[in-house]
Amino acid sequence: MTADGRPGFVAAVCRFSFEKDFPVPTSQQIAELKAKLQNVIFEREPNDTVAVLTAQGNRIGLMQSCIAIKLTADARFSESFDLQNNALVIFPNNKTSDPQALSEAFARVARPLHDAGYFVQWRDELLSVFDLDSGKCIALAERGLFRFLGMLTTSVYAVGTRRNGRVFVSLRSRTKQVDPGLWDALAAGMISANESRETAVAREIAEEAGLTCGYRIGSGWTCLKIRRTVPEGWMAEDAYVCRVVVDDDAHPKNVDGEVEEIRCVSKDELFAMIERGLTPVDTGLVFLNSLF
């Protein structure tokens, strides 16, 4: 089962035929599929939630009310979290707005929260914590905390094509915890703390496609906003998307073990894959917005 609860897609990948001809999708089919996926990745904030605030009043996340109540009732974390005026205040005794002090507070609480089972994935990677109103980075925190606290993440997607318009798709490892066995973009991943999107996309292309040269990144970026409930909590992500044209004599090959296979398919094939649920929902919409 995939992260968004869709069963059986790993088996469906094995049954998909890359050799057959696929019909050209109509503009109506494209519009309907875009709308369908958009409804999945962008939800209204649920009613039974509370804002997550710093002691200085910075709004940084969103959490289900029942989880916030459970967390503040847990004696192990009574000094780190407090419910005040229908909001979850983190580190209520932290009276400074110093980013280093707030980062250290996140570091102190992250491992105990993980060990207590409040979130599952420990990534050992720091991401920027943003004030949702100003957009300013106010601290750094362990990546695993972000869905649990409903904090904003930023990511990059490299939509790779050949000069003839054929599109690269990468088969996600079946051992990945999120969307295993689905076909993704040429490269995609989180923007780490203090990293630009340009640096992040070059790093991801090197790690996932094995390319350090032999490609050209397009000049324009688009942003896909993802807001939805996930098993870990609330997913708030701004995904920055760029087009990448790969030279004909460059041959992408995964090097970090997170991709099992990289193929080059026609746009008609790609549409059929998206329509049949063989791509992650967010990646499917990235493809549709970028190529159709």
Question: How would you describe each model-predicted region?
Answer:
Residues 2-182, 190-203, 211-251, 267-278, ...:
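N-terminal leader/linker segments that precede catalytic domains of diphosphate-processing enzymes
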Residues 207:
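Catalytic-pocket segment enriched in acidic/His residues
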Residues 253-258:
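Short glycine-enriched loop/turn motifs at secondary-structure junctions
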Residues 264:
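Short aromatic/basic micro-patch
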